Curated annotation (Swiss-Prot):
Alphabetical UniProt keywords: Cell inner membrane, Cell membrane, Ion channel, Ion transport, Membrane, Transmembrane, Transmembrane helix, Transport
Family recorded in the similarity comment: Belongs to the MscL family.
Keyword field contains Transport: yes
Highest taxon of the lineage: Bacteria
Protein name: Large-conductance mechanosensitive channel
Organism: Yersinia enterocolitica serotype O:8 / biotype 1B (strain NCTC 13174 / 8081)
Length: 136
């Protein structure tokens, strides 16, 4: 089997394709959540806290000197990243919880009893005939 044929079979397996789709959708969802946090949630939150822009929160570890830029710890960006994570985690938790609920409901549906085989039908008829003879 040639290398390209093996690779094609590997790449076209359902799990690999599903994983690729999941990664692409996850990346797009991450950008949407980042925009939601940065552009929708944080501005009103900053306004409620007195017009604060969280991106500007930082500690100066070393001031700028000449051509050397300042060394800062941007904890405001970290706060935004934490909000991003919490929203993504809630969305994933909700999706998994819904999937588990649907899976449980599907599993709880009782399976239809199997239809009796021909042998079972014949045995039931013989049993019924024997019972009828004993009652006479």
């Amino acid at each position: 089997m040639s290398f390209m044929k093996e690779f094609r079979e590997f790449a076209m397996r359902g799990n690999v394709v599903d994983l690729a789709v999941g990664v692409i959708i996850g990346a797009a969802f991450g950008r949407i959540v980042s925009s939601l946090v940065a552009d929708i949630i944080m501005p009103p939150l900053g306004l409620l806290l007195g017009g604060v822009d969280f991106k500007q929160f930082h500690f100066v570890l070393r001031a700028a000197e000449g051509n050397i830029p300042a060394v800062v710890m941007n904890y405001g960006s970290f706060i935004q990243s934490v909000f991003d994570f919490v929203i993504v985690a809630l969305a994933i938790f909700s999706a998994v919880k819904l999937m588990n609920k649907l899976r449980r409901e599907k599993a709880e549906e009782p399976a239809a009893p199997p239809a009796p085989t021909t042998e079972e039908k014949l045995l039931a008829e013989i049993r019924d005939l024997l019972k009828a003879q004993q009652q006479k």
